[in-house]
Amino acid sequence: MSASAGNDARTKAAKQQQGAGAAERPATKGSATKPVEKRAPSRIHATWDGEQRFDAGRPGGKTLRLDGTGKTGQSPVDVLLSALAGCTGIDILEILAKRRTPVERLEIEVVGDRADVVPRRIIAIQLIYRIDGAGIERDQAERAIDLAVNKYCSVRESLATDIVISWSMTLNGEPYTPGGA
């Protein structure tokens, strides 16, 4: 079987599996997909080191140590949560920059709750943003986070639709939880 045929078969199987039981993520206000420039597929190469570790990265690029024990590198789940933090963080910075709102500091903590049964998948994620910037108003920060988490972050959009994702923030030292919770 050629690589192209294998990819076609995997794509077909994924579409069938999705239609067979996966719920479609409800569209958020303004989240209709619009055509974008076609990009090459993302490609990562992972090399096993003989233990419960892999070194993974773009071909010819820097690598990241994935460690099933968590002793010498991040676990695969840690990397997934890190990807969500990085993705939403980059989107937040871009959104605030477009509004000419300078950010002095952005820290993100991600807490992933896992199921008690194998495969111990993530069932809920809480994102905690700490943002500092003299000119940032609460509504600007809230809007940027909401857009990042619910519209623009491709990592978020790639997660299972039944994962509950919530967020809170501290803006210039003042805590805030959307909805007053």
For the regions a language model picked out, list residue spans one by one:
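Extended beta-strand/beta-hairpin segments
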Residues: M1-S82, I92-A181
